[in-house]
């Protein structure tokens, strides 16, 4: 009987070590949850779940549901085929997938927090113009009022004195524990401080004497607790799709491991959540997803291998240090759109924000700190013009970001004269410029997509491969593009050492984008399977002409591989070049920079010029506008061209019931004066990976050597785990014999005079045996129980 407790501990430890070793080798860890597509509504889903022993955790979105089974192992190296097969045979089940635990890393650079004090936030209003020009946006009257931001992370401390005044329960949920409370789980190391820190950057309350001030200090702030548990496709999708017609902006500072060898991105449900967000969120204007570009700089990682930052639906944000340098943790890639400030070297200041346990910190770091600053600036911009679409916001970022004060050796001028860098995108966000341009912004034309198959037959990569193709960008077709936004090079290739590859794409106007730089830690022989490398560097260029793809082996090794598929995907509009400003006349008051602020009678203000007729998509309205003088801000009542509602092509007012005509994809209701949208067409499913190309026999020997080398890390990981297990067993047996301590079936880790945190159980629960994993959690009112063990081991 005395041996039973430590035998159980050894078995449990061995199982945990096996799972850890499997994760280290990249093996899939299957959970006891399923994502299920069921037709018929929630009642049918509940009925199917009950009939087959599942518990319906709730709706992900649409007809997709999250099922859990108490009898299935919580973490397993193999899928549970019997349960899967039974559910698959149900007629109402259209699709299902047992969920796989994913590795997602929070993107902050760890440092011990310092004592709180009231700080100076140098990045909001600096004396040397090394700031984000936020004070100018505040001076124009924009503080984020009416805008809702949600932080997708490990929860937020909703009762923090600097957050409570702006907390929004409608923008919050605990996906990990399936309840509305996003309060983080407390630990001794404060592991779950990440979301609270990010929230304070966006919307910390102003003028209350606590900590600092958020960029959008009158915005509403919420949080989704989704990183403090198993992160699956369903968990990500539920988080990304939370309340999309209430939340305007989602800020995420996490992603796949920044280890320089991972290639990973959103799976089926998360990808669908992104698409639904931009097409249906905010009443059809599109949810805005702000993403941290990644902290893998020290590992020579590339954010183009991260399918979240590499997505056209996310606004990817990088970091700059206080002195305008590239931080040591920053990743360079062509999908980054812009930059905000964050931490740098030891002599450079960091970011001030709220911290866990109702504290304040001056040490928030990494691209984790950059993305929330961008979310705050976007909140100010949305307050200036709530009718901006998700693509309008990206255009505003491109047109107003500033390369000044940012140091890098890769600044280049693209085909339309804009400076762009793989480390900074188009430069630092400028809050003042963004809100000024947003107020009279013309909604961009509907997005077009032109797909061009480039490769006719597989090509050997060798030392260097160059693929050239002249395209007309779908000329003569309804999806013809003459003004670019995003460009994707979708590549399928095999290669015996993926990390040695460097890939570049050159546009017809000469802009050279690095789609992939060499990654020394990536020893994988998996290659890429229809991976969409994305670049923003050719924004506003004309895509017609010759495109060049370059793939090269950066090492001296005799590597080998084959490019089997190359699809060029162009996104943009049919507009001819950049829109010229309207002819200026009828101006009554000009600023020193020759921008009109007041028009004569009979004229309306449009993009700092006066026009007699507002352009299509705008309507004249008399509004209070903010005019910044040298020492003050004056409020002037003037006629301004304001945007029509996003559903209207032309209008007589800003409301959705003021439409006079509709876009081509919608029809006008002459009675209600509204435009009804046509349903979205379904997306094509991803093509299957082609079979591997046959190799000459002379290549068998190097391939075998590469295979043996690639398994060396797995062998070392296995041996390490075995040694750790032996040491653990010996030490545990010795301590057990010395202390005579008996566990009596209670699963509690103890340390001498240590505080042990355990989420969801009140203190009295420790006097009884722990409930099984299958039982319903109780006592949710107390989020953390601290147990102080007085026994000496």
From Swiss-Prot:
Q: Give the cofactor binding note.
A: Binds 3 calcium ions per subunit.
Annotated site location: Cleavage, first: 107-108
Start and end residues of the FU repeats are 577-620, 638-681
Q: Where is this motif: Trans Golgi network signal?
A: 772-778
The active site annotation covers 153, 194, 368
Extent of the signal sequence: 1-26
What the record says about the induction of its expression is: Up-regulated in cardiocytes in response to stretching for 48hr.
Region described as Cell surface signal: 758-761
Q: Which GO terms describe its biological process?
A: blastocyst formation; cytokine precursor processing; dibasic protein processing; negative regulation of low-density lipoprotein particle receptor catabolic process; negative regulation of transforming growth factor beta1 production; nerve growth factor production; peptide biosynthetic process; peptide hormone processing
**Enzyme's top EC category:** hydrolase
Q: Name where it mostly resides.
A: Golgi
Q: Where does this protein hold Ca(2+) 3?
A: 258, 301, 331
Naming one, the record's GO cellular component terms include:
endoplasmic reticulum membrane
Which residues does the annotation say bind substrate? 154, 191-192, 236, 253-258, 264, 292-295, 306, 308, 368
The regulatory note on its activity is: Inhibited by the not secondly cleaved propeptide. Inhibited by m-guanidinomethyl-phenylacetyl-Arg-Val-Arg-(amidomethyl)-benzamidine (m-guanidinomethyl-Phac-RVR-Amb) and 4-guanidinomethyl-phenylacetyl-Arg-Tle-Arg-4-amidinobenzylamide (MI-1148). Inhibited by Decanoyl-Arg-Val-Lys-Arg-chloromethylketone (decanoyl-RVKR-CMK). Inhibited by heparin/heparan sulfate-binding.
User: Any idea which UniProt keywords this protein has?
Assistant: Autocatalytic cleavage, Calcium, Cell membrane, Cleavage on pair of basic residues, Disulfide bond, Endosome, Glycoprotein, Golgi apparatus, Heparin-binding, Hydrolase, Membrane, Metal-binding, Phosphoprotein, Protease, Repeat, Secreted, Serine protease, Signal, Transmembrane, Transmembrane helix, Zymogen
The cofactors it requires, by name, are:
Ca(2+)
Q: Which InterPro entries match?
A: Furin_repeat, Galactose-bd-like_sf, Growth_fac_rcpt_cys_sf, Kexin/furin, P_dom, Peptidase_S8/S53_dom, Peptidase_S8/S53_dom_sf, Peptidase_S8_Asp-AS
Instruction: Cite the binding residues for Ca(2+) 1.
Output: 115, 162, 205, 208, 210, 212
Function description: Ubiquitous endoprotease within constitutive secretory pathways capable of cleavage at the RX(K/R)R consensus motif. Mediates processing of TGFB1, an essential step in TGF-beta-1 activation. Converts through proteolytic cleavage the non-functional Brain natriuretic factor prohormone into its active hormone BNP(1-45). By mediating processing of accessory subunit ATP6AP1/Ac45 of the V-ATPase, regulates the acidification of dense-core secretory granules in islets of Langerhans cells.
Query: What is the protein's name according to its record?
Result: Furin
The organism encoding this protein is Rattus norvegicus
